[in-house]
Amino acid sequence: MRLDKFLKTNRIIKRRTVAQEVAKAGLVKKDGRILKPSYEVKPGDILEVSYGRRTLKILVTDDMKYQILEERFRGDEDEESN
């Protein structure tokens, strides 16, 4: 399944056009490499998706759903150091 469709179908991002824009902006990575919207997502892939203030690290499951491995919010690091 294409990356943009995967993000939309699993409601990680609400609209496919927004998912395409996020990918084109370099905000979706696998193993530190930026992915294109046309990347074919496979079970076992670990993706890092940055959207808004949120960054998700997700594992793609066998049924093409996902499991959240880590969730961070931009700005949280600043508050913790105070």
Residue ranges and their predicted role:
Residues I12-I13:
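Loop/turn elements at beta-strand to alpha-helix junctions within RNA-recognition modules
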Residues R2-K5, T17-N82:
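Strongly charged
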